[in-house]
Amino acid sequence: MLYSLLYGYFNINLFQYLTFRAGLGFFIAFFLTLFLMPKFILWAKAKKANQPISSFVPSHQNKKDTPTMGGIVFVFATIVASVLCASLGNLYVLLGIIVLVGFSFVGFRDDYTKINQQNNAGMSAKMKFGMLFVLSLVVSVLLSLKGLDTFLYAPFLKNPLFEMPTMLAVGFWMLVFLSTSNAVNLTDGLDGLASVPSIFTLLSLSIFVYVAGNAEFSKYLLYPKVIDVGELFVVSLALVGSLFGFLWYNCNPASVFMGDSGSLALGGFIAYNAIVSHNEILLVLMGSIFVVETLSVILQVGSYKTRKKRLFLMAPIHHHFEQKGWAENKVIVRFWIISMLSNLVALLSLKVR
C-alpha cells in the first residue's frame, strides 16, 4: 500500500529499495506487536483462553493461567506490515501471506478446541493433518503453476542434484510444509524455545531469498536465481520483527504463549521460504533444533512400540533435559546457541560452493 502510493504515484525513490522497505516492515511489525500484545493478554485472560498444561509435566503447572494464541497477534502484525511495505502484485508475497493465514487458522482451530475442552489434545489428528495436507497441496500446486523450477539443490554445491518431475516436486514440497510446520509445533514447549530458533532460521532464509531475487548477487555467488522472489524478503523481515515483539512477552517467565496459531504459521512460512529459495535440504541444518525435537518424538514412539522401552525420560527432547534436572532457562539458551551456530554454518554455503 505505502509502496504503491509513495513510489508508484509520488515517485519517492526511497521506497524502490527492497532493503529500506524490509527494514520499515520490520519496525512496523515489531512496534505493532508490542502495542497489541498487552491488550490481547488482558482479553485472553478475561476469556480464560489459557493453555491447558499436560499432567506429565508437573513443573509447568504454574503456567496454567498463562494465555495462549499469541501467534494471532504476530501473524496479524506481519500481515499489516507486509500490506504497507511489500508489493501486493507479487505472487510470492501473496502466497506467503496465504501460508501465514492458512496455517495460523489451522492452529487457531486446534487452540480453540484445547481451550474449549480444557485438555491438551486439541483437534483429532486426522482433522488437523487433513487441513494441513489440503493447505500444503494448494500452495505447492500454485507454486508449480507459477513456474517455480523443480531443481533440487544441496548445500555447498553450485549445480543442482537433479530436476524433479512436477508431480514429485509437488509431493516433496508438501512434505516440507507438513514436516516443518509440525516440527516447529513440537518445539514450542518452553518459553521462547520456538520463537528464537525461528528468528535465526527466518533471518538466514531471508538472506537466501534476497540473493535469489537479485540478479547480480545470485550471479556472483553462483546461486540459483528466482525471478521476483526478492519481494518476499519484506514479508520475512516483517515476521522477524513481530517475533521480536512477541519475544518481549514470551521470554521466561512467559506472559503469553504463541499456541498452535503461531507455531504452525511459523513452520509453514519457514517451509515456504526454504522451498522458493531452493533450500529444502539446507533447512535440515538451519532448523536443526526443530529436526532434533521431531526425531526425539519419532524415536521415542518407535522404541516404545517395538521394544516397550523409552529412549528418553520424556519427549520432545527439551522435556528430557528438564527431567534430568536442567533449569528451563538453561535448556532454552543452550538450544538457542545450537540454532544460532547451525544457521551461521548454513550461511557459509552462500560463498562456499
UniProtKB/Swiss-Prot annotation:
InterPro entries: Glycosyl_transferase_4 (IPR000715), PNAcMuramoyl-5peptid_Trfase (IPR003524), PNAcMuramoyl-5peptid_Trfase_CS (IPR018480). Its cofactor is Mg(2+). One of its GO terms (cellular component) is plasma membrane. Its EC number is 2.7.8.13. Keywords: Cell cycle, Cell division, Cell inner membrane, Cell membrane, Cell shape, Cell wall biogenesis/degradation, Magnesium, Membrane, Metal-binding, Peptidoglycan synthesis, Transferase, Transmembrane, Transmembrane helix. It is found in: Cell inner membrane. It catalyses: UDP-N-acetyl-alpha-D-muramoyl-L-alanyl-gamma-D-glutamyl-meso-2,6-diaminopimeloyl-D-alanyl-D-alanine + di-trans,octa-cis-undecaprenyl phosphate = di-trans,octa-cis-undecaprenyl diphospho-N-acetyl-alpha-D-muramoyl-L-alanyl-D-glutamyl-meso-2,6-diaminopimeloyl-D-alanyl-D-alanine + UMP. The chain crosses the membrane at residues 24-44, 66-86, 88-108, 129-149, 160-180, 192-212, 229-249, 256-276, 281-301, 330-350. One of its GO terms (biological process) is cell wall organization. It is an enzyme of class 2 (transferase). Pathway: Cell wall biogenesis; peptidoglycan biosynthesis. It comes from the Bacteria. One of its GO terms (molecular function) is phospho-N-acetylmuramoyl-pentapeptide-transferase activity. It is a multi-pass membrane protein. Belongs to the glycosyltransferase 4 family. MraY subfamily. Catalyzes the initial step of the lipid cycle reactions in the biosynthesis of the cell wall peptidoglycan: transfers peptidoglycan precursor phospho-MurNAc-pentapeptide from UDP-MurNAc-pentapeptide onto the lipid carrier undecaprenyl phosphate, yielding undecaprenyl-pyrophosphoryl-MurNAc-pentapeptide, known as lipid I. This is Phospho-N-acetylmuramoyl-pentapeptide-transferase. It comes from Helicobacter pylori (strain P12).
